[in-house]
């Protein structure tokens, strides 16, 4: 009979910024995960704060990256933005999930990074920041469903 191991707690490698003493100073979290793939296409993480996600996706499309920022739902789960969401900090996870065969292998090396993909994501996030800062939800502690 197969057994499933259920850990008593989850391990997350962090510097502690989601801890209560630091969380009060964090306005929002934008997690950029696996952004360097040449075939960049970002679906919408289902756990992310919708208002943050909407701003970034709208900005990306306005910059002409309609094939990058797509409306396909992505069920990531267990990613690095979870502790921030649990601390009540609005968070968005931009993660490349489709068709990257080198993920978590010894072949996942810097030569696989696309400067163009990094530029697209960096440009989009940078252009999104003023809208995020001006949004009524910025700095509040609503649920991730907004």
What spans do the regions from the language model cover?
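Short glycine-rich, acidic/polar surface loops and turns
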Residues: 75-94
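Residue-level preference for alpha-helix termini and adjacent loops
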Residues: 25, 41, 83, 102, ...
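Sec-exported extracytoplasmic/periplasmic mature domains
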Residues: 15-19, 57-61, 65, 86-89, ...
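Acidic/histidine-rich catalytic neighborhood of metal-dependent amide-processing enzymes
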Residues: 1-55, 59, 67, 73-81
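His/Asp/Glu-rich mid-to-C-terminal helical/loop segments that flank catalytic regions of hydrolases
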Residues: 101-146
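Structural recognition of the beta-strand scaffold that forms the well-ordered cores
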Residues: 27-33, 91-95, 102
């Amino acid at each position: 009979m197969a057994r499933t191991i259920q850990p008593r707690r989850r391990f997350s490698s962090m510097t502690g910024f989601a801890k209560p003493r630091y969380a009060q100073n964090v306005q929002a979290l934008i997690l950029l995960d696996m952004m360097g793939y040449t075939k960049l296409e970002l679906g919408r993480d289902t756990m992310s704060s919708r208002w943050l996600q909407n701003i970034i996706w709208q900005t990306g499309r306005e910059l002409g990256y309609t094939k990058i920022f797509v409306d396909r739902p992505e069920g990531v789960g267990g990613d690095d933005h979870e502790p921030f969401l649990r601390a009540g900090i609005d968070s968005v996870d931009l993660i490349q999930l489709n068709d990257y065969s080198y993920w978590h292998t010894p072949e996942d090396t810097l030569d696989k990074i696309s400067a163009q993909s990094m530029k697209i994501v960096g440009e989009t996030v940078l252009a999104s920041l003023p809208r995020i800062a001006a949004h009524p939800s910025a700095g509040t502690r609503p649920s991730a469903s907004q």
